[in-house]
């Protein structure tokens, strides 16, 4: 699967500080990547109703992490997926009378266009589930051969395959939830804890036997069917990055059961106790009092904002004005503030000189290194813009150019 064009990232003088992020599994700030090669996996979209502000908030946040790593001088490998076959996609295709493959292709292309518009660095490894089916089949076969999975007769013939969580004593270490909370979230987020015959209610689906009217693939030894959700990301991450890797990223609603189960699969498949050194999760974006959600339909789409004439960098700044791991609400005021900020920064940057640029570079670097504190980074640039527009500070030739390159390179905001 092809990704989107990479934006040009300006080179800045010096190097950035080591970036620390909040690890969900431990609740502590940790160095995001300790070696010279940083490896990141971020769960991608299920391609329908792309790309809403919840998506954008997540991918912009991890884009800042990638940019900070590059500023440190690290080599970065970024992997992501597209869940281009899944129940919600199939349900939407049926409801709209569109072939599921056409819907997935159209929405994946729209997502790529939106990421290009927002200046997001594309993944180096970008794979759809459909193209990864052979690798998923091999992983499920391996789990069965190790007695870490089992078969359960499907209603229409053939066998579904489930992971046996008793093979992984580490299950639960990512989200750190009580059993009752895990059961509730499993039922809410695509699991089937009440299915009869399962060894444990939380055992996740690895392979779904063919059902009438659903896509399926031949899999010798498994029978025709399609992959379960969690094993897809486990396979794409391990194939694209190797195990262990540095950061597993995604929205906070993916911590359980998705990231919990993917990590479990990788532990059993690879024998690696901690497949991702850190799990980093972004907050939820709300709109009109509820989490922005495809099921609720309360979506604000990037493409619609841009079609309505909103400056793309204002959309990006609206996201960056909030701490990545905090929940926040999209409002007209949030957008208006971001639009005013873009205009103000551009006025301040329009001259040949201005206040000293080095404090801005140092301040933005320090903010980004401190758990991607983009609101603090914006405040640093705001202060410089205020001083520049007031014209009451010593004048430094070329300062606006350095500031513009700083916000472009580290925040992805092109002036």
From Swiss-Prot:
<dbReference type="GO" id="GO:0010125">
    <property type="term" value="P:mycothiol biosynthetic process"/>
</dbReference>
<feature type="binding site">
    <location>
        <begin position="43"/>
        <end position="46"/>
    </location>
    <ligand>
        <name>L-cysteinyl-5'-AMP</name>
    </ligand>
</feature>
<feature type="binding site">
    <location>
        <position position="43"/>
    </location>
    <ligand>
        <name>Zn(2+)</name>
    </ligand>
</feature>
<feature type="short sequence motif" description="'HIGH' region">
    <location>
        <begin position="45"/>
        <end position="55"/>
    </location>
</feature>
<keyword id="KW-0547">Nucleotide-binding</keyword>
<dbReference type="GO" id="GO:0004817">
    <property type="term" value="F:cysteine-tRNA ligase activity"/>
</dbReference>
<keyword id="KW-0067">ATP-binding</keyword>
<dbReference type="GO" id="GO:0035446">
    <property type="term" value="F:cysteine-glucosaminylinositol ligase activity"/>
</dbReference>
<dbReference type="GO" id="GO:0005829">
    <property type="term" value="C:cytosol"/>
</dbReference>
<comment type="similarity">
    <text>Belongs to the class-I aminoacyl-tRNA synthetase family. MshC subfamily.</text>
</comment>
<dbReference type="InterPro" id="IPR014729">
    <property type="entry name" value="Rossmann-like_a/b/a_fold"/>
</dbReference>
<feature type="binding site">
    <location>
        <position position="229"/>
    </location>
    <ligand>
        <name>L-cysteinyl-5'-AMP</name>
    </ligand>
</feature>
<feature type="binding site">
    <location>
        <position position="58"/>
    </location>
    <ligand>
        <name>L-cysteinyl-5'-AMP</name>
    </ligand>
</feature>
<feature type="binding site">
    <location>
        <position position="258"/>
    </location>
    <ligand>
        <name>Zn(2+)</name>
    </ligand>
</feature>
<keyword id="KW-0479">Metal-binding</keyword>
<feature type="binding site">
    <location>
        <begin position="251"/>
        <end position="253"/>
    </location>
    <ligand>
        <name>L-cysteinyl-5'-AMP</name>
    </ligand>
</feature>
<comment type="subunit">
    <text>Monomer.</text>
</comment>
<feature type="binding site">
    <location>
        <begin position="81"/>
        <end position="83"/>
    </location>
    <ligand>
        <name>L-cysteinyl-5'-AMP</name>
    </ligand>
</feature>
<dbReference type="GO" id="GO:0008270">
    <property type="term" value="F:zinc ion binding"/>
</dbReference>
<feature type="short sequence motif" description="'KMSKS' region">
    <location>
        <begin position="291"/>
        <end position="295"/>
    </location>
</feature>
<feature type="binding site">
    <location>
        <position position="233"/>
    </location>
    <ligand>
        <name>Zn(2+)</name>
    </ligand>
</feature>
<keyword id="KW-0862">Zinc</keyword>
<dbReference type="Pfam" id="PF01406">
    <property type="entry name" value="tRNA-synt_1e"/>
</dbReference>
<protein>
    <recommendedName>
        <fullName>L-cysteine:1D-myo-inositol 2-amino-2-deoxy-alpha-D-glucopyranoside ligase</fullName>
        <ecNumber>6.3.1.13</ecNumber>
    </recommendedName>
</protein>
<dbReference type="InterPro" id="IPR032678">
    <property type="entry name" value="tRNA-synt_1_cat_dom"/>
</dbReference>
<dbReference type="GO" id="GO:0005524">
    <property type="term" value="F:ATP binding"/>
</dbReference>
<dbReference type="InterPro" id="IPR024909">
    <property type="entry name" value="Cys-tRNA/MSH_ligase"/>
</dbReference>
<comment type="function">
    <text>Catalyzes the ATP-dependent condensation of GlcN-Ins and L-cysteine to form L-Cys-GlcN-Ins.</text>
</comment>
<dbReference type="InterPro" id="IPR017812">
    <property type="entry name" value="Mycothiol_ligase_MshC"/>
</dbReference>
<feature type="binding site">
    <location>
        <position position="285"/>
    </location>
    <ligand>
        <name>L-cysteinyl-5'-AMP</name>
    </ligand>
</feature>
<dbReference type="GO" id="GO:0006423">
    <property type="term" value="P:cysteinyl-tRNA aminoacylation"/>
</dbReference>
<keyword id="KW-0436">Ligase</keyword>
<feature type="short sequence motif" description="'ERGGDP' region">
    <location>
        <begin position="188"/>
        <end position="193"/>
    </location>
</feature>
